[in-house]
Amino acid sequence: CGRVVAQAPCFEESLLVQEIQRGVMLDALEDHELPEFRSEEWLWQALVLAVRDNARAHGASRAVVALEGDLPSSLLAALAVDALGPRNVIGLVLGRNRIFTPAQEEAEAARCAAVRAIAERLHIRTVERDAPDAARVLDRDVSAGDAERLRSRTLGLMLEDTALELGAMALSPLSKTEYALAAPALCGGYQGDFAPFGDVYLSTLEFVARVRNRTSAVVPQ
């Protein structure tokens, strides 16, 4: 069984120098001095580092996140803030235009309120854009299912355009689960410059969100 005599901090750059002399027994670190493995906490730290490194690789200091008011996009915004700082994160808010009933109007108002609340708690600025009416653009009636798919494509286009305009990196909230189950629907659409949750199952995001909310309760659960 080995003994740990020195350790660098986890998920941080550091220079660790430990002198070792032949025949000299060094004191080992106590168990309480060693980091305790907590999968969700370490996963979050790894994701923060991944966003920071990818932004550097893209030559960008800022990131754009499409805010939808749901868990994945809210958690992604919090991740970007932890990685780059709130002043370097922009939230894109895309309105919905296919609202026909009072219930839909109420749901959209609640969604917009949730999005603005998340942006306020994270101290990030938002860019609001309106989605074009698919039926008018295509000059035909569009079913609800087609309209939702077209909105997803439009959101990707708006995300790409906003990122290009601001010289920022576009982040995608897609998880490993969505890449596996919705691959045909994703083909042909813009999915951002980087998807931090691409190797994280959708079911894991809830547990990661709880870890992030211990710092400050910004992510809806």
Where are these regions (language model features)?
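RNA-binding accessory domains that recognize and position tRNA/RNA substrates
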Residues: 1-66, 74, 81-88
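A conserved beta-strand->alpha-helix junction
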Residues: 12-22, 88-146, 157, 161, ...
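A conditional alpha-helix N-cap/helix-loop micro-motif detector
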Residues: 44, 108, 149-153
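Residues on a specific face of well-ordered alpha-helices
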Residues: 45, 49, 78, 113, ...
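Generic beta-strand/beta-sheet core signal
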Residues: 66-68, 74, 92-95, 129-132, ...
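Short glycine/serine/threonine-rich phosphate/pyrophosphate-binding segments
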Residues: 73-76, 100
